Structures are given as C-alpha cells and as structure tokens.
C-alpha cells in the first residue's frame, strides 16, 4: 500500500497537526521523520476542551488504536520527550510500545547542544533559533560524532561519561560567571541519562516496522515537521532549519522508498506568518494591523509559536513562495487553514502573485535569504467578507468572496483545494467537493 504525506508549504505553523489529526483515523501508522523538539504542533483530542501541544510525538497519538512512529531523521531530545509522554498521559491518552515506537537510529540532543545553541543566540551570531540544540546535534551527526538512541542500551557509565564530557568541553567556552562546577555538570548529565530510561521500551527498528506494514497493504501517513521554506537546501538559506523538510527528506527520515509514495497534501495558512529571523517579503508593517491579525496570546488559534510563545511575524498571503513548495514537493492537494482569519486584514486582502527581483518579474521565489531580501511583491487585491465562518461546514455555505479566495489559490497554484480550516477544533473543517 502507499505512504501518504502531509507537509507544510510555508514557514511552519500552518496547522498541519490538525489535518493529520483529522486524517489519522484512516491510517495504520502515523509517522514523523524530520525535525525535533524545535517543531511544535497542536491537536485537540476527541472530547477534550484544551489543545495538546506536541513536539516530537506524532499527532496520531490522539487515536489510541494507531501506531505512532518517530523515525531515524528526527533529532530526539530525551528529557523533553519524556515530559511530553507524561503530558499525553495526563490528557487521558495511553502511551505504550503498542502505540509509540522510536527509531534506534535517531540522533540524540545532548545537554551541551542546547547550551551551545543558547550561547550562540545570546551573541552577535543569533539567528532566532528555538534554542533546542538542533543545529549542534545535526553538526555532530554529519561529523559522525553523534550519539544515537541505540546508545542508551550501552553501560550507563559509558554514556554518562560521553554526556558529561560534552558539557565539560562547552563549559570552558563560557564566561567565568556562567560556568558550572564539576558537581553541577555531573548532576546535569545524570538527569539527562535518567530521562532516557523510560524510552527504552519504545525503541525499535522502525524502518522494518513501516515497510512491513506497507508490504502487508496497510496505509501510512507521514507528518512533516516545520515547512518547506525552512528546508536546509530549498529554503531561505541561511535562515533555515538543520534538516530537509521536503517530501524527499521525510521519506529518507523514515527509511521508505519513493515507490511507496502516494498522495501529497500540502498545508498552507490563509494568513502568512513566520517566527524568527530571515526575510518576509510580504510582511505587514502596520503593527496595529499585525496585532489584529495575530490575535491575543493564549488563544488556541493565535499567531504565537507553540515551542517558544514568541509572536509570529505576519505577512500578506504569498502565492510566489507557495509555487516553489508545490513544485518541489509534488503536491497533489491543498489544505488551507485559517480561512476565517482573512477578514482581519480589512475590507480587502493583498495577495502576492509575483516578485520584482533585479529588474525582472518572477513567479517563483529565490531560495536565498539574501535574494529574498531584495524582492518586492506585486499584489492582487481580493475582497474579503463579513460572514463568520467558524460554524460553516458545507462549502456551498461559504460566502461568495471566500469561495473566490479559495479558487484563486487553486487557479494560481494549479492544485485543487480539498480541505479548509475555519477554526482550531477538529470538526471545524470544510471538505471541498471536487469539480
């Protein structure tokens, strides 16, 4: 059978988790194959009133009878993951080796990786990272000096020494007033090691597990972390993440051949946003307008980072960047979230249809932060609508201007829209009939 994929087409925070949550019931396995604790997503379990914030556990955990897999391409943070498992259980959902497996080949985020990340972000080389240590665990991976999850089965004294040694090395780089004592280093390393104990029960050869299911005719849903424009190769380098966020990267991070690839669903928000540094060509510069679009901190569907609570920068809808993402990911269907937020822009909304760059007009975006900073958007104005959409469930009940907005995306991107989000809850999704 096939492996279907859901990927973000913008810069993260598109609402992928809620569409995975919606579709998960149709699949035997829900898997994550990239990203790490720096990639947050939220789901609202059936019957729950409060959202569940996840980072490393797949969104399918909201379905107790589904197997969730964390693949070899994920950068795993053991203390954070252990806490996440407890949070899921506190929400009334079971977690065991029956519904969660983790690749033995996943690389581990160590305490000194996070320390290095924090140190860099406090200096002049800050890039607006989530301080999750991802860049540094990735560096160790490609230097072939990393520690994989399989190492937690080594004698604990050996692993403890490796972790402590990393802390000691970084400790020497710190200013005198921030250095840790030997006792503090030992304590930090020991706490990290203890967090790996409960993970042992979930460790498996997930490549074998997933491929066995596919050969048996089962369906697998791969959930992409972050989004296209944060991809290490095709994104706005260097304001990117440290892994591939494309469909091909996700397949590699799960150990699945491209011959199993089925449907690719690309998720985009009707409201564009971005957390951290890097250019935002269509950025809303009117701060009062940006605040209105963003919404208040603490509300489920407001524009604040799941991982950091940082306010997201707000932009106008951008079809130029979306064309790159649709092309390289081979997107078959579009899911649009937050259609209900479009009227926050005002009576009309500006939609970027092309850029001017170095005296030429282009319909796709350059994959470079430097080049993007030199682009100017060309907009088409679309009228918004007055009707509240949060209770709409039938496409035929959408106001005409909302339909025009959706169909403008379809025409410009050459891909059908199949699902439309009009609120944060699982049921607040409109299925768009095919033409």
Residue ranges and their predicted role:
Residues 1-435:
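Non-transmembrane, aqueous-exposed alpha-helical and coiled segments at domain scale
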